[in-house]
Design a protein with these regions (language model features):
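Generic alpha-helix signal with a bias toward terminal, lower-confidence helices
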Residues: 55, 112-114, 137
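Generic detector of bulky aromatic hydrophobic side chains
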Residues: 94-95, 101, 111, 125
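Short amphipathic alpha-helix segments
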Residues: 107-123
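Short, flexible loop/turn elements at secondary-structure junctions
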Residues: 81-83, 103-108, 132
């Protein structure tokens, strides 16, 4: 999570509707995150996420189809929308969160660490992390 002193206070962020989280990329049942800190937990501290990430990265160079199946088991967070609990299409749209996610894929490894570090210090970034492949960046 970004600790910039210029960011909105955590209390202010948590008054707004929270993004929906799905148990996997294929799941259609969701629930809203309980707090902004949940993002950090699910991405950086969750044992299931860590296990799936490690399996995915090991398999990417061996069996891309199996790696893709592993990836689809990962959690999915929809930053911009809070869905009604039983759907994942626009007909189940409930509330806007006013959040935005930037997703950069295939970042050259020579600059990825630098980009992660730089984005982590932005007052506008709530979370900065590498994608499941380890070759991308999400802000």
């Amino acid at each position: 999570m970004n600790e910039s002193s210029d960011s909105l206070p955590l209390e202010e962020l948590e008054k707004a509707p929270m993004p929906s989280i799905f148990s996997s990329l294929r799941a259609t049942v969701s629930k809203p995150l309980q707090s902004v800190l949940d993002i950090e937990h699910y991405i950086k501290c969750n044992q299931r996420t860590e296990m799936l990430t490690q399996q995915y990265r090991k398999l990417m160079n061996v069996d891309t189809k199996l790696a893709g199946n592993i990836k689809r088991q990962s959690i999915a967070i929809c930053p911009s929308i809070q869905f009604l609990p039983k759907g994942r299409t626009l007909e189940y749209f409930d509330k806007e969160t006013y959040w935005l996610m930037l997703d950069y894929d295939h970042v050259i490894s020579l600059v990825l660490d630098e980009k992660v570090e730089k984005a982590s210090h932005s007052k506008y970034a709530m979370a900065v992390y590498r994608t499941i492949s380890g070759k991308g960046l999400r802000i």
